[in-house]
Design a protein with these regions (language model features):
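Short, well-structured alpha-helical segments
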Residues: 95, 99, 136, 140, ...
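Active-site-adjacent bridging/hinge elements
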Residues: 67-82, 214-228, 452-461, 549-559
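Divalent metal-dependent catalytic cores for phosphoryl transfer on phosphate-bearing substrates
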Residues: 128-331
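Acidic/His-rich, divalent-metal-binding segments that scaffold phosphate/diphosphate chemistry
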Residues: 2-186, 203, 210, 218-219, ...
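Phosphate/oxyanion-binding active-site loops and adjacent basic polyanion-contact surfaces
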Residues: 90-109, 240-248, 471-474, 569-576, ...
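C-terminal effector/catalytic modules and regulatory tails appended to multi-domain proteins
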Residues: 1-75, 291-296, 300, 306-309, ...
Length: 777
């Protein structure tokens, strides 16, 4: 079984169209969106979910130009439930949840050929690339915006919860209904006329309700007037429940109609009705209601399925929700008409939770498997599906009968497992709200603009909104990094008034007499920039004469270690660091920078050595390397050192980068000479060292925090080997177990700079040594 990230990547691997059916490939936008989704799936953080929303809105421009036209709509959802959700008994995050739903749908589309065919047959776009493009567009709208109406349900639920806390459940309790609904959902005459032209077979379209009921009539055959009546009744007369799905559909419709040149189509109407149906509409007591088949409404079918299955890594706000355990990750196996999901729970839960104190919704372990295989599956696919599938071991709790949300045309298998979750401990972090990040990114762009005006050959677009998506994200990534950079010098920022010392002069920290924080942070900024460029498909290269040619080829001469940068380029990193303080203070929501010694983990340096050439599978060796590194990460601030020779050294560095660790390079020659020497050594040893191998080595070295040359012209390799052993606390060695030694006339071993010599030196110095066995030719 695979992770959602691995499963989702297939969609982008096969996608050839990203910016429209008449452009066969816009690789930058495609890579930006894929990178944003991958980053979010690795972190689960809201600020990374925000970048997914931004990429989608920038690519498709469904609300007008770019992200700014829908900024408030999305960010207010997150802000509102953050501040209001704690007043409820049960409530979990919907902002990041929607991005998970988006990614899960992409994974199902990529791996389930039956669903792809159903979508293609339903919409008939022609070739697979065009189908994938339009699926991405309309599925993105459905999934990312399906919960934007949740604040309406929150307001209703808060009053209900308040009354029940005081008087208990009582028919005499107050409940909220929303006034002025007819004006809120009304459509002006021009919009109504355009809708009549688009849907000539429909009745008048004076309200959004009429439009929604028409869409349900066309796709599912629901009687239009009956649906209109139920929509109004559920909003104005509902005591126990307010359907956020209805308000999500209404808000999205209003937003679409606010765009000057927007033209409604049946596809957009399918988006709206899919959102309307996803929560509880098929439970309305309306004529002709029934489970939805994929052939009737593919977008609705998929949203209901993914929305129900997304039951992991959801931040809890409500009192009971905070107490309920929830899976922190999943593993997937998707094929034609088959989905197998394993929900992974933190292994500590059984020890720390008492079953008797948990809510009825989820009782962990022995009962949870029964719940998801029984009630959970039955709610999606119906009780008949459970009864017809003896492979599902458990029966329904209390023998409840569920009609099901969707027609069961797939095999759905759900499991649970335990796996220890690695904790990221942080005492206090900066308040990285979405308002901060987007506005901060614009300030960074303005600052960079002002600086570059004085540089020959520099051209930067004055308007942030007109920047290519790649450069907008670059500024946002810089803004996101401010939190980590401040933490490195014992600071954080927040818009709250807190009882910590306020920093009034950041330069006193940056230019500290006891520590060169400026140089350190500049190095960190360069490494961040290098990793960003590499993740977007850029490479090291010098074969260009203009910025336009450089950007077209996606090559850059500055993808090198910080030490090799010209002073002009180093000054750009310094600009970012020195601008942190002034840019944060320019934000409108009263941001302050506070000083707080955070009690860092003890620092430990791990050296990596090993053979240049071995015949074992590198994946298994990488797993072992990461296992040892992760052991030390739990309790230490880990720095990895290596000489970056071909083979094991570079493999260890690669693993360290994968884990987000700081890496230092200690090389025996100057940079260019060493790369040449590594290539020649490989050729002498009978191994092909290709241009791709050299480029990979350059890219690895460019990500190092320090690239230091150990100067010893006579014993260069021996000196470098001894240097990293002397500096390290722990040695990880990829070794074949053979002690190859040479002795001098006094019968003392000679340091040849080889793997065994490093192991021997470390053991003689009583340093911890971890050996990972390998085989050599």
């Amino acid at each position: 079984m695979k992770t959602l990230l691995e499963t989702c990547n297939k969609f982008f691997d096969e996608l050839k169209i990203i910016s429209g059916p008449h452009q066969c490939d816009n690789s930058n936008d495609k890579i930006c969106l894929e990178k944003a989704i991958n980053t979010f799936l690795k972190s689960g953080q809201k600020e990374d979910a925000f970048v997914v929303y931004l990429c989608f809105c920038e690519i498709f421009n469904v609300f007008g130009q770019g992200y700014t036209n829908t900024k408030k709509l999305l960010e207010m959802l997150s802000d509102h439930e953050y501040h209001s959700g704690e007043l409820l008994a049960k409530h979990r995050d919907h902002y990041s949840h929607s991005v998970y739903v988006f990614a899960l749908g992409l994974a199902i589309y990529a791996h389930d050929g039956a669903f792809r065919k159903a979508f293609s047959d339903f919409y008939g776009y022609g070739n697979s690339n065009v189908n994938s493009y339009y699926f991405l567009k309309y599925w993105g709208l459905v999934s990312l915006f399906h919960d934007i109406g949740y604040p309406f349900e929150l307001a209703h639920a808060q009053i209900r919860t308040y009354c029940e806390e005081i008087w208990g459940k009582d028919d005499k309790n107050l409940y909220i209904s929303f006034g002025n609904l007819n004006n809120f959902i009304s459509l002006d005459s021009d919009v109504s006329k355009r809708l009549r032209k688009t849907f000539p077979q429909g009745n008048s379209f004076g309200t959004i309700n009429k439009l929604l009921s028409y869409g349900l009539n066309v796709r599912l055959g629901y009687e239009q007037e009956a649906v209109e009546h139920k929509l109004e009744d559920r909003v104005l007369s509902q005591k126990n429940f307010m359907d956020h799905a209805y308000f999500s559909a209404v808000l999205l419709a209003k937003k679409l109609f606010s765009v000057a040149d927007f033209e409604m189509s049946m596809q957009y109407l399918d988006v709206l009705t899919a959102i309307l149906l996803h929560n509880s509409f098929n439970k309305y007591e309306a004529p002709d209601r029934r489970p939805i088949a994929v052939s009737e409404h593919p977008l609705s079918y998929l949203l209901i399925l993914c929305d129900e299955l997304q039951s992991w890594d959801r931040l809890a706000y409500g009192k009971i929700s905070k107490r309920d355990p929830i899976a922190w990750d999943i593993r997937l196996d998707i094929a034609d008409k088959s989905i197998k999901i394993k929900y992974i729970f933190d292994s500590f839960i059984n020890k720390e939770y008492n079953e008797d104190n948990l809510s009825v919704k989820i009782v962990y372990n022995k009962n949870y498997l029964e719940m998801i295989e029984g009630e959970f599956v039955a709610k999606i696919l119906g009780t008949d599906y459970i009864l017809d599938n003896p492979s599902i071991k458990s029966s329904l709790n209390n023998q409840k009968y569920y009609e099901g949300y969707i027609v069961p045309n797939l095999d759905l298998t759900l499991e649970v497992a335990e796996e220890k979750k690695e904790k990221k401990v942080s005492l206090i972090t900066s308040d990285k709200s979405f308002f901060n990040l987007y506005d901060l990114a614009k300030l960074i762009h303005v600052s960079y603009n002002e600086y570059c005006k004085g540089l020959e050959g520099s051209r930067v677009d004055e308007d942030f909104g007109k920047l290519p998506l790649e450069y907008k994200i670059s500024n946002i990534d810089t803004a996101k990094s401010y939190s980590d950079k401040l933490a490195r010098i014992d600071c954080f920022y927040s818009s709250k008034d807190l009882d910590y010392p306020v920093v009034t002069d950041i330069n006193k920290l940056i230019y500290s007499s006891y520590k060169d924080n400026r140089e350190f942070l500049c190095r960190e900024e360069h490494v961040r920039w290098v990793k960003e460029k590499l993740s977007l498909g850029w490479k090291y290269g010098t074969d260009y004469v203009s910025v336009e040619e450089r950007n077209r080829k996606k090559i850059h001469k500055c993808i090198v270690p910080y030490e090799l940068l010209p002073d002009e380029e180093k000054s750009k990193d310094a600009l970012m660091i020195e601008g942190i303080f002034t840019q944060l203070l320019k934000l409108e929501n009263n941001v302050k920078i506070y000083n707080y010694p955070m009690g860092h983990k003890p620092k430990i340096e791990i050296a990596g050595v090993g053979h240049r050439f071995f015949i074992d599978d590198t994946d298994s060796i990488k797993q072992e390397i990461k296992r040892w590194l992760q052991k030390y990460i739990e309790t230490n601030q880990v720095v990895v050192r290596t000489c970056f020779a071909y083979g094991a050294d570079q493999l260890i560095a690669e693993c360290a980068f994968d884990l987000g660790l700081t890496v230092k390079a200690d090389i025996p020659l100057d940079y260019e000479s060493y790369i040449k020497d590594v290539r020649e050594d490989a050729i002498r040893s009978g191994y092909r060292f290709t241009d791709s191998d050299e480029l990979r080595m350059r890219h690895l070295l460019a990500q190092t925090a320090v690239c230091k040359t150990i100067i010893d012209p006579v014993h260069k390799y021996e000196a470098a080997s001894k240097y990293i052993v002397d500096k390290c606390d722990v040695l990880i060695a990829i070794w074949d177990g053979k002690a190859v030694e040479l002795f001098n006339e006094n019968k003392k071993p000679i340091n040849r700079g080889g793997t065994y010599d490093s192991i021997r030196l470390a053991r003689e110095a009583n340093k911890t040594v971890h050996v990972i066995e390998c085989r050599r030719n």
